[in-house]
Amino acid sequence: MEILRARDMGFCFGVRRAVEMMEQSAQEVGPVISLGSIVHNPQVVERLRQRGVDVARSLDELADASLPVAITAHGVGPDVVAELERRGLDVIDTTCPIVVRSQMWAKRLADEGYAVIIFGDPNHKEVRGVLGWTKGRGYAVPREEDLEHLPEDLPHKLGVLSQTTHHASHFARFVQRLIETRLDRISELRVVNTLCNATTNQQVAARELAQEVELMIVVGGRESANTRHLAEVCQEEGVETYHVESAAELRPEWFTGKERVGVTGGASTPDFAIDQVVERIRELAAS
């Protein structure tokens, strides 16, 4: 059996930067509290916990005011930043620079009187944070079909952003659907490309690899949006696809009769997790 790795996969710049910043802080100043999971990958969260980075799920859990608090790569809204400052906490801001750009565009558009439409999951940490910068003028829309649920009395000036982990073609279809369904109510439309190039590159690489193999294994946390999107991209190519968090989830029957297997990993998936999956596939192929 031939095992092929996607040419672009695993930790993106933003995640790698956030993990390194938290590890460095824990090493230099002692224990650190992360406000929410560092990334949507349980292996990374556990590894950081062992190195002194614990997780508080909300502001209410920040009982110890003596420990530094880390904002995760997903970012937060200005209300959270203000509350951390009010409490006098030392803050380590690991927000991905690409997410910061999205936040600043959300604020700018809202300040200029636009309603801000965000193509993204309203429950995703990044999207919740970006919405916080719109001063109540933002709307998260998870699918193009949900555009019909937008309020009828929206301002005639609309700004459109995307969750950074979405695919470019999906964002393009979303914008097209918005134009088709609301053009008569729009006097001005401003679309800002807030997609992450690293995520897009990984999706392109996954799609290319999916066309060359009989089976795709996508490695990453179940809660990771970009990993789920990778699996969707592979499935769109018609190839048998499985999303696993670890090598322990691999099933021998998946590989029966397969000669070419592809492996990719999401932007929050560490190299060691991908390596373990590849090694386990080799073991299953040899058995």
Q: Which stretches of residues belong to each language-model region?
A:
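The feature marks the mature, well-folded catalytic cores of soluble enzymes
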Residues: 1-287
